[in-house]
């Protein structure tokens, strides 16, 4: 038992050395947010990353909590072309849940476990400048990222804080916009030229049939979308990953957030547990 523990530490050592001082952007969502054990393990993983000299930045989602709050308030969601319409009232609820509830819970839990976390949203210091997303028709205050101003993030991480970001952006029209958390995380990672972007999902990674694909180049990932291997909700995640890698991010990891300590298992072991997308070296 003791030698197993030593071997785990020895396996992690070269990765701890390699990533010391590097920035990781982690999208927290899916199973990791819903399962108490996974949620607790996520907090522990972030604290450990911080203590090993890595600079973690968290971007979180919260779709199910928004739906639950709307239900509690007796507001029926409206859908157009399969997408939720975010009118002004819905946007207020989105902001209340993401910024006022989920963000503060994550910050509190990190701080209780020895971190120095600060909660912000994309509106703060114009971190995320957004514009209306129109590819699905007019669905209200759903936005896409127009620009990221990362100065506030540099200030926080240089002063040893862990930024926790709710993906609510500010439009040049002064309106708040709800932004997909994967997209927000990818754009933030690109703006920082982060070493890694880690997307926590509800599945083990990119699958071919029931077999996990451990590594992909951006070109290979796009081929899997074209040939129908990658389908449904995994398509936008893979597209985000490809965009991030081509935008200067060292590597993107798509992993199952429902697996306890998924981040540590992916980052600090040779085999990993998910799919890594990166350019070929050399």
From Swiss-Prot:
<feature type="binding site">
    <location>
        <position position="84"/>
    </location>
    <ligand>
        <name>substrate</name>
    </ligand>
</feature>
<keyword id="KW-0963">Cytoplasm</keyword>
<keyword id="KW-0418">Kinase</keyword>
<keyword id="KW-0055">Arginine biosynthesis</keyword>
<feature type="site" description="Transition state stabilizer">
    <location>
        <position position="27"/>
    </location>
</feature>
<feature type="binding site">
    <location>
        <position position="178"/>
    </location>
    <ligand>
        <name>substrate</name>
    </ligand>
</feature>
<dbReference type="InterPro" id="IPR036393">
    <property type="entry name" value="AceGlu_kinase-like_sf"/>
</dbReference>
<dbReference type="InterPro" id="IPR037528">
    <property type="entry name" value="ArgB"/>
</dbReference>
<dbReference type="GO" id="GO:0006526">
    <property type="term" value="P:L-arginine biosynthetic process"/>
</dbReference>
<comment type="pathway">
    <text>Amino-acid biosynthesis; L-arginine biosynthesis; N(2)-acetyl-L-ornithine from L-glutamate: step 2/4.</text>
</comment>
<dbReference type="InterPro" id="IPR001057">
    <property type="entry name" value="Glu/AcGlu_kinase"/>
</dbReference>
<dbReference type="GO" id="GO:0042450">
    <property type="term" value="P:arginine biosynthetic process via ornithine"/>
</dbReference>
<keyword id="KW-0547">Nucleotide-binding</keyword>
<dbReference type="InterPro" id="IPR004662">
    <property type="entry name" value="AcgluKinase_fam"/>
</dbReference>
<dbReference type="GO" id="GO:0003991">
    <property type="term" value="F:acetylglutamate kinase activity"/>
</dbReference>
<keyword id="KW-0067">ATP-binding</keyword>
<protein>
    <recommendedName>
        <fullName>Acetylglutamate kinase</fullName>
        <ecNumber>2.7.2.8</ecNumber>
    </recommendedName>
</protein>
<dbReference type="InterPro" id="IPR041727">
    <property type="entry name" value="NAGK-C"/>
</dbReference>
<comment type="similarity">
    <text>Belongs to the acetylglutamate kinase family. ArgB subfamily.</text>
</comment>
<dbReference type="InterPro" id="IPR001048">
    <property type="entry name" value="Asp/Glu/Uridylate_kinase"/>
</dbReference>
<dbReference type="Pfam" id="PF00696">
    <property type="entry name" value="AA_kinase"/>
</dbReference>
<feature type="site" description="Transition state stabilizer">
    <location>
        <position position="237"/>
    </location>
</feature>
<dbReference type="GO" id="GO:0005524">
    <property type="term" value="F:ATP binding"/>
</dbReference>
<feature type="binding site">
    <location>
        <begin position="62"/>
        <end position="63"/>
    </location>
    <ligand>
        <name>substrate</name>
    </ligand>
</feature>
<keyword id="KW-0028">Amino-acid biosynthesis</keyword>
<dbReference type="GO" id="GO:0005737">
    <property type="term" value="C:cytoplasm"/>
</dbReference>
<keyword id="KW-0808">Transferase</keyword>
<comment type="function">
    <text>Catalyzes the ATP-dependent phosphorylation of N-acetyl-L-glutamate.</text>
</comment>
């Amino acid at each position: 038992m003791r030698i197993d523990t030593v071997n785990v530490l020895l396996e992690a050592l070269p990765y701890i050395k390699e990533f010391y001082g590097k920035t990781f952007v982690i999208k927290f969502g899916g199973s990791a947010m819903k399962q108490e054990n996974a949620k607790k393990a996520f907090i522990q993983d972030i604290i450990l990353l911080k203590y090993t000299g890595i600079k973690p930045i968290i971007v979180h989602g919260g779709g199910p909590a928004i739906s639950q709050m709307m239900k509690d308030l007796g507001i029926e969601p409206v859908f157009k072309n399969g997408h939720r319409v975010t009118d002004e009232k819905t946007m207020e609820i989105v902001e209340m849940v993401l910024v006022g509830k989920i963000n503060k819970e994550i910050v509190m839990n990190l701080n209780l476990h020895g971190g120095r976390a600060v909660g912000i949203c994309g509106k703060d210091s114009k971190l995320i400048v957004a514009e209306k997303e129109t590819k699905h028709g007019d669905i209200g205050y759903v936005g896409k990222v127009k620009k990221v101003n990362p100065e506030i993030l540099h200030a926080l991480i240089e002063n040893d804080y862990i930024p926790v970001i709710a993906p609510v952006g500010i439009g040049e029209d002064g309106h708040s916009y709800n932004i997909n958390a994967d997209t927000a995380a990818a754009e933030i990672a690109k703006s920082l030229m982060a070493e890694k972007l880690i997307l926590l999902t509800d599945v083990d990674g990119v699958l071919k049939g029931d077999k996990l694909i451990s590594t992909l180049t951006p070109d290979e990932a796009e081929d899997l979308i074209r040939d129908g291997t990658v389908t449904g909700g995994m398509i936008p995640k893979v597209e985000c990953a490809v965009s991030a890698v081509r935008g200067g991010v060292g590597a993107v990891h798509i992993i199952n957030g429902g697996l306890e300590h998924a981040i540590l298992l992916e980052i600090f072991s040779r085999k990993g547990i998910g799919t890594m997308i990166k350019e070929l070296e050399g």
